[in-house]
Structures are given as structure tokens and as C-alpha cells.
Amino acid sequence: NIVLTQSPASLAVSLGQRATISCRASESVDSYGNSFMHWYQQKPGQPPKLLIYLASNLESGVPARFSGSGSRTDFTLTIDPVEADDAATYYCQQNNEDPLTFGAGTKLELK
């Protein structure tokens, strides 16, 4: 199974500042010219919401404050600027190889 390691486990960011979350895969998640890495936001009591698909593509309706980058094994989710509504837990997920796997999550708190 591909293991996804997120860092940091938690972070506190002031409103208007930048938040950066990293996800490292134990092996490449690239195939056919795409990176099969996705990012989700989850708030308590709610299902996960897809933010970024295929490493860098913004899901419809998601603010452009969210962006994703990376390839092969190293990926980043950036939120810039952070707004109050962004307090949540963020997960990376790969589906290049079965079984699909998730990172352990990064909890974003507002200072």
C-alpha cells in the first residue's frame, strides 16, 4: 500500500496569512502524465469536501485561495490568504494504486 505522510499534524495560522501543508507518498503516484493526488477539507460532522484533484486542479466552486502543487512523491496544499472558514482538517489522498489511501490529516486552527 502507498503510505501518505502529512506534515505538520497541526498548525495555527493568523487570518490573512499563508498555510502550507505537505504530503509525501512512499512511492510515486504519477501515471499517464498525471499525478493521482487529491486534497480534501473536512469539518466536524461533515463529509470530506474535495478541494484539489490531480495535484493542482481546483474543484469547481472552491476559492482560488486554495492551490496544489507537486508530482511523483511530494505534494503541497497552500491556502493563501487563510480565512476564518478554513479552520478544518485537511487530507491528502492517492488513487494511483489500489487500495486508495489517505494521509493522517492536518488540523488547521486560526490564531
From Swiss-Prot:
- Would the keyword Lyase be found if you checked this record's keyword annotation? no
Q: Which GO terms describe its biological process?
A: adaptive immune response; immune response
Gene3D superfamilies recorded: Immunoglobulins (2.60.40.10)
Q: Tell me which GO cellular component terms the UniProt record holds.
A: immunoglobulin complex
- Region (Complementarity-determining-3) residue ranges read 93-101
| Region Framework-4, annotated ranges | 102-111
Q: What is this protein called?
A: Ig kappa chain V-III region PC 4050
UniProt keywords (A-Z) are:
Adaptive immunity, Disulfide bond, Immunity, Immunoglobulin
* Region of interest (Framework-3), ranges: 61-92
Segments carrying the region annotation (Framework-2) are 39-53
Q: Where is this region: Framework-1?
A: 1-23
Q: Which organism is it from?
A: Mus musculus
Instruction: State the superkingdom.
Output: Eukaryota
Record-linked InterPro entries: Ig-like_dom (IPR007110), Ig-like_dom_sf (IPR036179), Ig-like_fold (IPR013783), Ig_sub (IPR003599), Ig_V-set (IPR013106), IgV_Light_Chain (IPR050150)
Question: A Pfam family for this UniProt protein?
Answer: V-set
Provide the residue span(s) of the region labelled Complementarity-determining-1. 24-38
Note the coiled coil stretches, chain numbering. none
**Annotated region (Complementarity-determining-2), positions in chain:** 54-60
Q: Which cysteines are joined by disulfide bonds?
A: C23-C92
Lineage runs: Eukaryota, Metazoa, Chordata, Craniata, Vertebrata
